[in-house]
From Swiss-Prot:
Gene3D superfamilies: Cyclophilin-like (2.40.100.10)
Catalytic activity: [protein]-peptidylproline (omega=180) = [protein]-peptidylproline (omega=0)
Keyword annotations: Isomerase, Rotamase
Span of the signal peptide: none
Protein name: Putative peptidyl-prolyl cis-trans isomerase
Function: PPIases accelerate the folding of proteins. It catalyzes the cis-trans isomerization of proline imidic peptide bonds in oligopeptides.
UniProt keyword Electron transport, yes or no: no
Amino acid sequence: MANYPQLNKEVQQGEIKVVMHTNKGDMTFKLFPNIAPKTVENFVTHAKNGYYDGITFHRVINDFMIQGGDPTATGMGGESIYGGAFEDEFSLNAFNLYGALSMANSGPNTNGSQFFIVQMKEVPQNMLSQLADGGWPQPIVDAYGEKGGTPWLDQKHTVFGQIIDGETTLEDIANTKVGPQDKPLHDVVIESIDVEE
């Protein structure tokens, strides 16, 4: 299963473990620098420098995803460590499965600081059969069938990590009440992100 690191919850050699502390609990992820080096470097540097501390999940759509990482909390803000937007790092080894940590963007090669965590729990059966026909690897099709996810975002958003603990926190955040533009009525705050290398 080495080809598909998301299918294994153990932190493997070369992966980076991070713990995201929120006011709704903790979520633990493993990041994939071998798959998305610039994206992981961007996230880890921001995490270590406290860039994400106090930032909210400004967009929460239950049974789809939770999005954060924007200091302006508008969906329009946030910068990369590289000064401008940076390129996508798509891979045939990482997919937008349930619990994937993935980059938000506004089109090709527009990555900054915003990210989302996939929270869709079921992929429709007709879509699963299309994935197999469309060239998705069978272990990934099976994982989408078992875990859920958002396969239509594959090759459109860079996947650079996977939740390995704290799914209950992800669900709690996803179930928060929201108002206009899917913004939570009560702030869901990222207090800090610890990097364990």
